[in-house]
């Protein structure tokens, strides 16, 4: 590449530009979790904005004369309010003018591609078709949609640039453009098939060959050339090129946009969506991403890469895994001193010709995966939340950068440990000539992506081979440049201007699915990202023997900094010979999978938002509604006092003439009868519509309650019990005693803590105390079945702690900056309070009242 100068800009391919501009964030990690400090290499320069338009507009040519403005390789921070705002806004106009010119050319290219489509379709139904309808739809797949998206974008942006002033806003246009990248995902997935189909049709049909070799592209308005001839293959590549260009422009726009400008948050969001999309698309579409040649002399390309946890010698190691066209390579980033070029160290590789996936029977014979203790994972999460709050406080108080960096380092260490120790879903691969390897993933979606990518490549005519030490060194050396995933997926690697994600509760109704070719037993699971990785949150019932399942099931999913929702559709396996005994080994067949971004503007509206996810020809319809954490923290008393939900516990017990509310006794009895061995009891969401039905029956004191309970899904019954405690107008352990519980659990001296915590129980009103002790003994019995139901005392404390303790007056916590801060400060303590009582020897109501050892003073 020629050196940069102030006289002009070097011409770069989009992929070179991508590497130059997209190496953000710390790449400094070690597989064992040690962070390394690294400075920029001496003499390094930042890369200016590059536009590769075939014809540069006069406006764009003008800005290339100076070349003094550059884009930092780190994420753009934007201009401080009022700092050179005029210059920044003028630069915005220059960037937009150049982008608009290239957008015009891109639209002309799409038009040229669409031009032959109509006549080809017209001949498809005649006796002498050039192409079949199927071939036409494959070759021109999504081109019309992409054209319409960009034409609308261009038509809206053009007048804003032409009638420029400092008040012009266009961030919403870029945000909308980014939100439509799903169309590009569909195009990219089909790209290879489209090229192969076009090539085959050219070979078999001279007429189509003539058309595809000379498509006329209209020149821009200011250009002397009216038309240029371009091949169909070259034009089909343009949409892929365009996504990267748009992302680079967003960086430039953010750099030259004041942070207090209304466009700034919209451009940030557009950039986040674009970057997520870029990291997810399959990079084998670019033939220039070549490492070395395969044994057959073909180019070896990188298809997929990412960070996975490997079980190596009974310990977990974070690896960077690279899937090439004919080999899977597992590597670790070497430790290097500051300023040195980083390199990968190859741990092992398997030629795809030798790679096999073990059968369920073979997997059973493999050593079982022992999950990390849940309470330790929860401790990590609460530490991370607390550190996030401390960092925000330091920033708000304009604290020292060293203190903030120390906190960030601690947060990275905890997030790294969580990422390393939380995955439990096994992904086993085997080299037919020797060793087996085991990765652990947190998401079945991710496992499916890796498996499908490998199996797709294995359909080709692959040969077995052994790499020489030199060949292995060359291949490993290429990984640093070729990688598409640069950073470990932890939130501490995020930039300050990136969206923190959503905190609260997402209500999702999975309505139905269609597009299945034959009847099957079908169900869906829902995954959301949390703390940087995806976890499964809910599962619909199995709809049997159908091609059009109608679930209409509602779920409440807790979000912790979440940005995406995934839906996976499975065919249920009832063949017992194929069922794996490993609880984490899902052997049901994935029929389709899809993902959507949780756009805060769309999700945070109070109304239900209905959408459709397309996956492998299958369409799943769902609706969602989001409740922010600050809203979900509020307890709302019931307006009517005849029911049980939202009514004071003392009122209910007095009306029923009972010591423990009937709803609590019946739900606990049913759980102990048939749900105490249910995996994830109280943790897994019940169907929301079932829970609402039970709520209505209990509120109406319907005589059919017992019959309905016996027929209802056990997770719905567990969910009803949780909902009852959550909707109490004041928490079971009362608002009055809440501060004292927080102080008591923080005491260091065991004897003082014992006296204080027991005294607080004695201070509770009798209905509250008796109900609490009744629930406490039940939860202990549930935890006794932990080897089967996977619910430890800590798990149960995490589920019930906030429900039993969370105060009704959240507004009193005005000193805390956000709902997320409230959560991170208080939840840890709420969980610890309940855990203290769960771990305590049995507490008798009579002995507690009789015992005079505890303090008798009022709280």
Swiss-Prot record:
Domain PH: 301-459
Keywords annotated in UniProt: Cell projection, GTPase activation, Guanine-nucleotide releasing factor, Phosphoprotein, Synapse
Annotated TM spans: none
Site (Arginine finger): 683
GO biological process per UniProt: actin cytoskeleton organization; activation of GTPase activity; brain development; cell migration; establishment of localization in cell; inner ear morphogenesis; intracellular signal transduction; macrophage migration
Disruption phenotype: Mutant mice show impaired spatial and object recognition memory with reduced maintenance of long-term potentiation (LTP) in Schaffer collateral-CA1 pyramidal neuron synapses.
Domain of life: Eukaryota
Broad class of where this protein is predominantly found: other
Domain C2: 484-613
Residues covered by the DH domain: 91-284
GO cellular component: axon; cytosol; dendritic spine; glutamatergic synapse; plasma membrane; Schaffer collateral - CA1 synapse
Disulfide bonds: none
Record function comment: Protein with a unique structure having two opposing regulatory activities toward small GTP-binding proteins. The C-terminus is a GTPase-activating protein domain which stimulates GTP hydrolysis by RAC1, RAC2 and CDC42. Accelerates the intrinsic rate of GTP hydrolysis of RAC1 or CDC42, leading to down-regulation of the active GTP-bound form. The central Dbl homology (DH) domain functions as guanine nucleotide exchange factor (GEF) that modulates the GTPases CDC42, RHOA and RAC1. Promotes the conversion of CDC42, RHOA and RAC1 from the GDP-bound to the GTP-bound form.
Name this polypeptide is given: Active breakpoint cluster region-related protein
Species this protein is from: Mus musculus
Lineage: Eukaryota, Metazoa, Chordata, Craniata, Vertebrata
Gene that encodes the chain: Abr
């Amino acid at each position: 590449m020629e050196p940069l100068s102030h006289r002009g800009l070097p011409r770069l391919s989009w992929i070179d530009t991508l590497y130059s501009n997209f190496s953000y964030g710390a790449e400094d990690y070690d597989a064992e979790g040690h962070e390394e400090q690294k400075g920029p290499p001496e003499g390094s320069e930042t890369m200016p904005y590059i536009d590769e338009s075939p014809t540069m507009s006069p406006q764009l040519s003008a800005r290339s004369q100076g070349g003094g403005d550059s884009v930092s390789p780190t994420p753009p921070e934007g201009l401080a309010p009022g700092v050179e705002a005029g210059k920044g806004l003028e630069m915005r106009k220059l960037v937009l003018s150049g982008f608009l010119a290239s957008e015009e050319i891109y639209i002309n290219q799409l038009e040229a591609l669409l031009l032959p489509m109509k006549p080809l379709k017209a001949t498809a139904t005649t006796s002498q078709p050039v192409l079949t309808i199927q071939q036409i739809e494959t070759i021109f797949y999504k081109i019309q949609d992409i054209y319409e998206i960009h034409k609308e974008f261009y038509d809206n942006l053009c007048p804003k640039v032409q009638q420029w002033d400092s008040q012009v806003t266009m961030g919403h246009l870029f945000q909308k453009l980014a939100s439509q990248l799903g169309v590009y995902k569909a195009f990219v997935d089909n790209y290879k098939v489209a090229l192969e189909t076009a090539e085959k049709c050219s070979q078999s049909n001279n007429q189509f060959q003539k058309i595809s070799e000379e498509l006329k592209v209209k020149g821009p308005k200011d250009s002397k050339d009216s038309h240029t001839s371009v091949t169909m293959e070259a034009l089909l590549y343009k949409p892929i090129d365009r996504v990267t260009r748009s992302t680079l422009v967003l960086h430039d726009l953010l750099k030259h946009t004041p942070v207090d400008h209304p466009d700034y948050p919209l451009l940030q969001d557009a950039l986040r969506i674009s970057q997520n999309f870029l990291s997810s698309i399959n990079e084998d579409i670019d033939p220039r991403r070549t490492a070395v040649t395969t044994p057959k002399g073909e180019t070896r390309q990188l298809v997929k890469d990412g960070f996975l946890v490997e079980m190596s010698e009974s310990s977990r190691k974070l690896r960077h895994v690279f899937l090439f066209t004919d080999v899977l390579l597992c590597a670790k980033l070497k430790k290097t001193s500051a300023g040195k070029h980083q390199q990968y160290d190859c741990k092992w590789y398997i030629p795809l010709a030798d790679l096999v996936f073990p059968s369920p029977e073979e997997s059973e014979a493999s050593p079982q995966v022992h999950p990390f203790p849940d309470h330790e994972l929860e401790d990590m999460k609460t530490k991370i939340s607390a550190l996030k709050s401390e960092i925000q406080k330091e920033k708000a108080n304009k604290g020292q950068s060293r203190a903030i960096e120390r906190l960030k380092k601690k947060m990275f260490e905890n997030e790294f440990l969580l990422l390393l120790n939380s995955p439990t879903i096994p992904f086993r691969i085997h080299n037919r000539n020797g060793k087996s390897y085991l990765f652990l993933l947190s998401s079945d979606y991710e496992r499916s992506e890796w498996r499908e990518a490998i199996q797709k490549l294995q359909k080709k005519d692959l040969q077995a081979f052994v790499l020489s030490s030199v060949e292995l060194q060359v291949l490993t050396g290429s990984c640093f440049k070729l990688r598409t995933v640069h950073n470990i997926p932890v939130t501490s690697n995020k930039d300050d201007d990136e969206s923190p994600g959503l905190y609260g509760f997402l209500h999702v109704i999975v309505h139905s699915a269609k597009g299945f070719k034959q009847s099957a037993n079908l169900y869906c699971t829902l995954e959301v990202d949390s703390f940087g990785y995806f976890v499964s949150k809910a599962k619909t019932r199995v709809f049997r023997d159908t091609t059009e399942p109608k679930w209409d099931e509602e779920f409440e999913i807790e979000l912790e900094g979440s940005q995406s929702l995934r839906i996976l559709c499975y065919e249920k396996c009832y063949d017992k010979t194929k069922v794996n005994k490993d609880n984490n080994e899902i052997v049901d067949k994935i029929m389709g999978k899809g993902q959507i971004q949780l756009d805060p503007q769309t999700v945070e509206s109070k109304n239900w938002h209905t959408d459709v996810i397309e996956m492998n020809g299958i369409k799943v319809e769902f609706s969602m509604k989001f409740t922010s954490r600050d809203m979900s923290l509020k307890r709302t008393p019931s307006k009517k006092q005849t029911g049980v939900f939202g009514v004071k516990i003392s009122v209910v017990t007095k009306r029923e003439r009972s010591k423990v509310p009937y709803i609590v006794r019946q739900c606990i009895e049913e759980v102990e009868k048939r749900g105490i061995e249910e995996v994830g009891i109280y943790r897994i969401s019940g169907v929301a519509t079932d829970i609402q039905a039970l709520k209505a029956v209990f509120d109406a004191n319907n005589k059919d309650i017992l019959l309905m309970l016996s027929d209802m899904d056990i997770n719905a019954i567990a969910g009803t019990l949780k909902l009852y405690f959550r909707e109490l107008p004041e928490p079971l352990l009362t608002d009055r005693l809440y501060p004292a519980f927080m102080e008591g659990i923080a005491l260091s001296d065991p004897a003082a803590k014992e006296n204080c915590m027991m005294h607080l129980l004695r201070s509770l009103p009798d209905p509250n105390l008796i109900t609490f002790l009744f629930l406490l003994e039940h939860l202990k019995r549930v935890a006794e079945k932990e080897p089967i139901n996977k619910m430890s005392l800590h798990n149960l404390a995490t589920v019930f702690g906030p429900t039993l303790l969370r105060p009704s007056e959240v507004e009193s916590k005005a000193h805390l900056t956000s709902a997320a801060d409230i959560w991170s400060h208080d939840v840890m303590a709420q969980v610890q309070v309940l855990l203290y009582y769960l771990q305590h020897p049995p507490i008798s109501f009579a002995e507690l009242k009789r015992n005079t050892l505890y303090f008798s003073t009022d709280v």
